[in-house]
Design a protein with these regions (language model features):
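Non-globular targeting/processing and membrane-anchoring segments
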Residues: 20-22, 147-416, 437, 471, ...
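Conserved beta-strand elements of beta-rich interaction domains across eukaryotes
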Residues: 55-58, 89-92, 114-117, 186-187, ...
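N-terminal leader/targeting and pre-domain segments
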Residues: 2-48, 78, 82, 87-92, ...
Length: 510
């Protein structure tokens, strides 16, 4: 009997790996290659390739996928010169390819220069793959070095302009572009190289490298200045924008794109025939509904992605996680198997000492997940929290939904309990989890400020707790309304949208 169970389990595992699903999809600016497409795409190509070899069943790869997707989005304009690529080594048909490239751990990232001819041309990336800005600069350095070494036909784009060259002469090489960017830096000129690659195929702007002592730079900045960027509009002799000291290349890129929208070669046409403004979105009641699918996706992402992002959890972080798991096990809504999963994980984490290896966490979580029939999904899916774009709403919406659902569940369970302490039982555990484990660092810091500003620690009753979450949520929505994180299809609104909707929405939410 025991052998039969082992064989059944082994077959299930083999089937799972043979039919491995990708961590990436068509919406990502990433090319997924396989054994039968890798050589044709990478070898003897005009483009360089930056390749992540990953396993779709590897916890580290699952946690890293959002980072690599974000990195690929940033490098989307670089695709004429370098392509971000992935290979799923968990897929049986790709195992020979991964062995050929000596991929022994996941994720492994390699740079293949343009014109590569074999596996030996792959350079393993040894930098910090979690530091996106630095990885982008490292790719620029790889490309610059390979162009220089191979005397590539485009190697000249990285050459600094001669110190004798005037601003007018720089414009002469700008073609029909209305904007000229001068990036000032000594070697290694990582910021200029990245910007030159980024805008290489953009007809709106020409970016050139100049040394800090170039007369045009000195005149504009009144001194030699390393690591600065000057943006000129055609016809002007003074820059319309100068980067602050220490600006990252991507911040400069975003600023240049803002000016392209105003002064680019297509800007006049858009002014002559302006597009009709997008219609004001009416209140869509579904955006205020609580959907079990959203809650399950949020809990899945929280447990499987957010918590295991670090190798170890210890000290105050572990205390905070224990408190949050206790809150979840008591008040998180969901199916009976989900509540059992949270209860068992809470029992397990409280049995630990002062340090938790997140590999142990993931293993235990997977063990409990399987034993309960996989009550949580293996990927996120959004209904009420779906955004018009993949990067909008989703998990952050799900977090707010979970907070509201837990606060309402706690209210219903404890409203007549005079001993109930909403701060200790619900609010502070949620606050500390967000502050310590939310992968959006800036979001975590902002919520920490909101908790202090709105006096979280002074909440006394279950009713005040429910209202506190809505008050803070409304405040955050007001602050972020119209920002880049606002979804035009589901604008950030105050809750409830009108007094007449209160009863309807409460019925939906509870």
């Amino acid at each position: 009997m025991q052998l039969r169970c082992i064989l059944i389990t082994l077959c299930a595992v083999l089937y799972r790996f043979a039919n491995a699903e990708s961590l990436y999809d068509a919406q990502d600016p990433i090319v997924e290659l396989e054994t039968d497409t890798f050589n044709a795409a990478v070898y003897n190509s005009e483009k360089a390739h930056f390749v992540e070899f990953y396993s779709s069943w590897c916890g580290a790869c699952i946690a890293y996928a959002p980072t690599f997707k974000e990195f690929a989005k940033h490098l989307a304009p670089w695709r004429p010169l370098v392509q971000v690529t992935v290979v799923n080594c968990a897929d049986d048909k790709n195992m020979p390819l991964c062995r050929e490239h000596s991929v022994n751990s996941f994720p492994t990232i390699k740079f293949f220069k343009q014109g590569s001819t074999s596996k030996d041309d792959g350079q393993q990336y040894t930098g910090n793959k979690y530091e996106i800005n630095q990885m982008e600069l490292d790719v620029a350095a790889y490309l610059h070095a390979s162009y220089e070494k191979d005397k590539h036909r485009l190697a000249g784009i990285f050459d600094p302009v001669d110190n004798t060259k005037t601003l007018e002469e720089m414009w002469a090489s700008a073609g029909s572009a209305n904007l000229l960017g001068i990036a000032s830096q000594e070697d290694p000129a990582l910021m200029p190289w990245a910007l030159i690659i980024n805008f290489h195929a953009d007809r709106n702007v020409k970016v050139v490298l100049a040394r800090p002592q170039h007369p045009v730079v000195v005149r504009a900045l009144e001194s030699e200045s390393n690591g600065r960027f000057l943006l000129y509009k055609r016809g002007d002799i003074t820059p319309i924008w100068t980067s602050p000291a220490g600006a990252k290349w991507r911040d400069i890129q975003e600023k240049v794109n803002e000016y392209i929208a105003i002064y680019g070669v297509d800007a006049k046409a858009s002014l002559v025939e302006p597009q009709a403004p997008a219609p004001v979105a009416n209140v869509d009641m579904t955006q205020f509904q609580v959907q079990l699918v959203d809650l399950k996706s949020t809990i899945f992402y929280m447990l499987f992605k957010e918590i295991p992002r670090r190798q170890f959890v210890e000290g105050d972080d572990l205390v905070a996680l224990k408190q949050w798991m206790r809150t979840m096990s008591k008040y998180a809504p969901g199916t009976t198997p989900i509540r059992r999963l949270l209860y068992r994980m809470n029992e397990w984490i409280w049995s630990l000492g002062d340090k938790m290896d997140t590999n142990d966490w993931t293993n235990k979580l997977q063990e409990v997940q399987v034993s309960l029939g996989n009550p949580l999904p293996d990927k996120v899916e959004w209904i009420a929290c779906i955004g018009s774009k993949p990067n909008l709403r989703g998990y952050t919406c799900g977090l707010w939904t979970t907070a509201h659902a837990i606060s309402v569940a706690a209210y219903k369970a404890e409203k007549n309990n005079a001993q109930f302490n909403p701060v200790n039982e619900v609010m502070e555990p949620f606050h500390q989890f967000i502050f310590r484990f939310l992968s959006c660092g800036e979001c975590a810091k902002n919520f920490n400020k909101e908790a202090e500003k709105h006096k979280l620690l002074q909440v006394k009753t279950a009713h005040e707790m429910v209202m506190w979450f809505w008050r803070v949520h409304n405040f955050v929505n007001a602050r972020l309304s119209g920002s880049r994180t606002d979804d035009p299809r589901f604008p950030k609104r105050q809750f409830p949208p009108s007094a007449s909707d209160v009863l309807h929405l409460l019925v939906l939410a509870v």
